[in-house]
Amino acid sequence: MAKLTVKDVDLKGKKVLVRVDFNVPLKDGVITNDNRITAALPTIKYIIEQGGRAILFSHLGRVKEEADKEGKSLAPVAADLAAKLGQDVVFPGVTRGSKLEEAINALEDGQVLLVENTRFEDVDGKKESKNDEELGKYWASLGDGIFVNDAFGTAHRAHASNVGISANVEKAVAGFLLENEIAYIQEAVETPERPFVAILGGSKVSDKIGVIENLLEKADKVLIGGGMTYTFYKAQGIEIGNSLVEEDKLDVAKDLLEKSNGKLILPVDSKEANAFAGYTEVRDTEGEAVSEGFLGLDIGPKSIAEFDQALTGAKTVVWNGPMGVFENPDFQAGTIDVMDAIVKQPGVKSIIGGGDSAAAAINLGRADKFSWISTGGGASMELLEGKVLPGLAALTEK
């Protein structure tokens, strides 16, 4: 990566501004998945071990009006982070003003402070999300000229807390998480060890058009699963019953198939049910066609066998999107078996592109078997699409 990293700057005695991604799920004020906090620890620990004073910024959820602030404070995150670090985390509970400034100025070397949810600034004119110039300058003024971006999950957005701060400091550098995310995903797509197989699932073709187009150029094979299968089926005149379909994307699906040169591999059967919820019958289809009154909710056993074969010998695999409704045990076989087929390949570099695929790997107990699981769904999708991420572009060149 041709950008400066946290190891390229002297941190001792400096107030170091750090954008992390602590956008974690909360239920009744309790964190239900702390992966993003854990992922930020190496960078935070490095800064404080080097004698820096870490000032952390993160958003949590969406905040558009005053009422949205309810349940969106980062207070539970501050407590969780303190427990993980084994030291106090200063939490003034505000995003600006004298209370925040005094707390920052009172920090000593090796201490950590967490600023309140950056999106609280969106209540009055979307200042965070619209990269308000004044807000970026103000937050930048709280530090000593060093900004560390370690929030891959928001790297595809130009916000005040990443791009805005970057524009107003002497050095904007990458943290370890951001550096690893870019290295794994970009290298997999741009300079893969071959054979390189991409697996794309999920419900909508529209979400993945750019990704499919880019990967058809870069990968040796692109396997398609999930709900978007049925848009590809219908584009070829195959019966899909009541399955999910994007009628306005049939021409796009047809076009992708025509220009794929045989690289695009679709399922050959499905697991179908007579309803999405409250179904009374689940069965495997004979072939591609879904029965009238039924809908496809997972890839079938023949498809699993074909995908297993397509993955044999793969040295690089990028997976984004489940094969079916994996949250339901009746429709998780495709996702489980494809995961197992990926990780059993000898010497494979296996990467999950965040989002539902990451949740599937974690929930189904396969997370530790992958080389890398991305912390950013949208950001990883844009990297897979070959786009430049604003949060990365704003960092200082080496």
UniProtKB/Swiss-Prot annotation:
Q: Pathway, according to UniProt?
A: Carbohydrate degradation; glycolysis; pyruvate from D-glyceraldehyde 3-phosphate: step 2/5
Q: Which UniProt keywords apply?
A: ATP-binding, Cytoplasm, Glycolysis, Kinase, Nucleotide-binding, Transferase
Give the multimer and partner information: Monomer.
UniProt GO BP: gluconeogenesis; glycolytic process
Recorded family membership? Belongs to the phosphoglycerate kinase family.
Please report a single Pfam family linked to this protein.
PGK
Q: Which reaction does it catalyse?
A: (2R)-3-phosphoglycerate + ATP = (2R)-3-phospho-glyceroyl phosphate + ADP
Extract one GO cellular component term from the record: cytosol
Annotated localization: Cytoplasm
Q: Which organism's genome codes for this protein? A: Streptococcus pyogenes serotype M5 (strain Manfredo)
Residues bound to substrate: 21-23, 36, 59-62, 119, 157
Q: Under which EC number(s) is this enzyme classified?
A: 2.7.2.3
Q: Which PANTHER family match?
A: PHOSPHOGLYCERATE KINASE, PHOSPHOGLYCERATE KINASE 1, CHLOROPLASTIC-RELATED
Chief place where the protein resides: cytoplasm
Q: Which GO terms describe its molecular function?
A: ADP binding; ATP binding; phosphoglycerate kinase activity
Q: Which domain of life is it from?
A: Bacteria
**Could you tell me what this protein is called?**
Phosphoglycerate kinase
Amino acids binding ATP: 208, 296, 327, 354-357
Q: Does the keyword Nucleotide-binding apply?
A: yes
UniProt signal peptide? none
